[in-house]
Amino acid sequence: MAIDGVKIIDSDQGYDIYNEVVGRYRDGDHVSNIIKDILDAEKDYCQTDFFTEIYWTALAYSLWKIGHLTDDIRDKTVELIQKGADPFWMEIDPKALKQRQKVLEKLAVQLQTENPRPLKVPKAKANTQ
């Protein structure tokens, strides 16, 4: 898995989760189905504490982005953030742990607020034929 930076979706896994949530939401899939499917795949994503951090932060961020962050996912993510960035970030880059922690702290604050401009589901165009 590629890690391109310390931001929430700067990894293949984070990007995959974000794209699945946003893509399915824009395609009109019901949010509860999206959440269920991603939570059902938790064991596949969360092989280590490092990947668990990426999984929960990407999921919470994605749901916040579409305006459908649930309290339980928010609370679990904030609890994980309070534990601090996983030490594996140091193996990626000596400065990454501190940088990631700043990103996580910013996300924790963001998750406590409602998204003022959530992504909208595009309206289906009427077929004129």
Question: Could you say what each language-model-derived stretch is?
Answer:
Residues 77-129:
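Amphipathic alpha-helical binding modules
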Residues 25-29, 42-45, 66, 84-88, ...:
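Short, flexible helical or helix-coil boundary motifs
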Residues 3-6, 15, 22, 42, ...:
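Generic intrinsically disordered, low-complexity segments enriched for polar/acidic and small residues
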Residues 1-40:
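Short terminal alpha-helical segments
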Residues 27-32, 74-77, 81:
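Short amphipathic alpha-helical heptad-repeat segments
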Residues 29-71:
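Amphipathic alpha-helical interaction modules
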Residues 6-13, 23-27, 69, 73, ...:
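Non-membrane alpha-helical secondary structure
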Residues 2, 16-18, 51-64, 94-104:
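Amphipathic alpha-helical elements of HEAT/ARM-like alpha-solenoid repeat scaffolds that form extended
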